[in-house]
Amino acid sequence: PITYVTNGIHTCTWLAPNLKELYNKYLPPYWQDNIQVDSTWEKIDNIPDQKLWNAHIERKEKLIKLIKQNVTNRYVNSGIGYDQIAEVVNKLDPNALTIGFARRFATYKRATLLFKDIARLTQILNDPNRPVQFVFAGKAHPADVEGQNLIKRIHEISLMPQFKGKIFILENYNIGISRYLISGVDVWLNNPRRPMEASGTSGQK
């Protein structure tokens, strides 16, 4: 008997168009219908490294552009001047390791776990030789006050002098923003409290 059903994602729905083009060219025909077959992915090494990397960089550049626009709109609506806005968004670095966290802001997902050691985080995010930046997005349930407080906390930390232009939180999270984040970040952050998370589908996309 079936004792459980694990949730998952539909690969082709979330696959970036330029990556799909590469897969269509280098993977076996009808690969979309054989995603679960090992031999399908044995051909992944046929894709030249540079082409695969260029496809990722293309998506990352689109994400950077989206972040700039989203943050600018949010700051303008908050009455923040353009000089201050430019000071923040111009620090976005397409060459930095970009780490993404986007999902429902439930407490067990621990969105603010990395803020437990502010001193260490400050050191990591301000290393000129190994640039790192974080981008957050998501919504909390209207009745989830603690989840809403997580969003508020991230916003407050993003305004701290040492984190300006290093930590971003996007407003009005939706499927469109999700697509940009999933395909554009370098690393997807997933650190839920065990065993509360079902499967972490936000990053599987």
Predicted regions and their residues:
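Catalytic cores of carbohydrate-active enzymes across secretory and cytosolic contexts
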Residues: P1-K205
